């Protein structure tokens, strides 16, 4: 399975095409739109969220709510396009009024202009914008429809913002906590920490600054055998890390105990193996985060990402004007103060795509009934 998406932040719409999705999977459009709505929420979001009310429209590959095996096309309209059409029309538009010649530190502006030979960062920032992630969330939600058939569930939550970290103890089995976190303004399981996080966000907003943080995705009921040890590009942890690192603002990824393993002895890190006639092989710890040697081991997969503060600052940093090469304050585009909660939803979608793709590879079926038969043969002996 693979997908391509296209569209600009102020363009007419976002479009995604997914090829290789199995036939006969029932699709609930409300589930896709629910995840899109979650992406738009979160304390610290910008004013654009008051304009856009994202809804997915399926154009092909699904008939009477069931996938057909043909390429699936999804479209999400940009409501803000009516305000930008005269600057963004693909055929004829005003290219001078919205010109951006002072690149923002930390954004794709300058590298994109240098790579493609632009004297205007507008074409770069329009595509580099995190607006693109709306389509990735829709595609990830579609993948969750497949994962749910096999009992695989994904949960996202925020563990840190601006140096404020949750203190509440939890395990990956605390599903109710993660479900309740969806009602939180920050998708946070710790109410006390959430209040402190909001204060940090408010302070940053008042100062014209931005804040980052850490989000976590937990994947439950993932069967063993997804991914492979035989080649670098088939390792499940490598695929997950690449997908998550591709999300705007992500600067680090860790699985399981993550970077903490570098400060521990091997005897403190590796999960001992036990066997029971009823449940088979099992572990009492999950420091590996559900993956060993690039292969899922049957434990919950736990993955975290570090999100940098958004590079658009209302109190701009110093930069250089591409016209004249003189020092100038960086450009300001409408932006968020904190997008970590939204980032956790995008992260969940990215993980869902990788897991669904790995599951299709493992169960090798063009239709759901074949996948179910293979699943029973492999896992329900």
UniProtKB/Swiss-Prot annotation:
Give the binding site residues for FMN.
127-129, 248-249, 293, 308-312, 334
> Gene Ontology cellular component?
cytosol
Q: Which residues bind NADP(+)?
A: 39, 45
Name the GO terms of the biological process aspect. amino acid biosynthetic process; aromatic amino acid family biosynthetic process; chorismate biosynthetic process
Gene Ontology MF, one: FMN binding
Alphabetical keyword list = Amino-acid biosynthesis, Aromatic amino acid biosynthesis, FAD, Flavoprotein, FMN, Lyase, NADP
The EC code for this enzyme is: 4.2.3.5
Biological pathway: Metabolic intermediate biosynthesis; chorismate biosynthesis; chorismate from D-erythrose 4-phosphate and phosphoenolpyruvate: step 7/7
**What's the catalysed reaction?**
5-O-(1-carboxyvinyl)-3-phosphoshikimate = chorismate + phosphate
Cofactor(s) needed, names only, are:
FMNH2
Signal peptide span: none
Cofactor note, please?
Reduced FMN (FMNH(2)).
Family from the record: Belongs to the chorismate synthase family.
Q: What does this protein do?
A: This reaction introduces a second double bond into the aromatic ring system.
Q: How does it assemble?
A: Homotetramer.
Q: What is this protein called?
A: Chorismate synthase
Q: Which organism is it from?
A: Caldicellulosiruptor saccharolyticus (strain ATCC 43494 / DSM 8903 / Tp8T 6331)
Per the record, the gene is aroC
